[in-house]
Amino acid sequence: MRIEPPDKSSAAGRRTARLTGPLLLLVGVGHVLLAGLLFADPLGDIASSGLIAAVPFDARASQEGAALWFTVNGVLLIMLGQLARAHQLQAGRLPASPGWLLVGLGLCGAVVAPVSGFWVYMALGTLWITDSRP
């Protein structure tokens, strides 16, 4: 089954409607690649421990735990970007609720960790919300 793009007249002048999915994919891939640079040692420790139960989750966060969640977050962003692209091709615009969730996640994260990438979530969420409008 082939997905046809929506009628061009309904999305005239809305170039951003085609950018949300690819930008999410780009941020997700960047996240995964950055995980390899920032967490090379902890990821190596996870691999050398045999993977099974290699990440301790106790009262204190470990480097292995941070590496795991940082990498998983990147993969989830890639998945979200793929879903956004497919939905944009099929429906022509995005539903607003995931955009609001991205803004909320970014805001909460930026409050807790102001020097972080959580600001990117707010930007992507705002773009998503813009792309949800008719």
Language model segments and positions:
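Structural signature of transmembrane alpha-helix termini at the membrane-water interface
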Residues: 33-40, 79-89, 107, 111-114, ...
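Hydrophobic alpha-helical transmembrane segments of integral membrane proteins
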Residues: 97-130
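Mid-chain, well-packed structural core segment of small domains
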Residues: 67-102
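Short, Lys/Arg-rich, polar N-terminal cytosolic tail immediately upstream
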Residues: 1-14
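N-terminal signal-anchor transmembrane alpha helix
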Residues: 18-40
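Residues within membrane-spanning alpha-helices of integral membrane proteins
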Residues: 21-28, 74, 99, 106
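Juxtamembrane membrane-water interface segments that cap and precede transmembrane helices
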Residues: 50-65
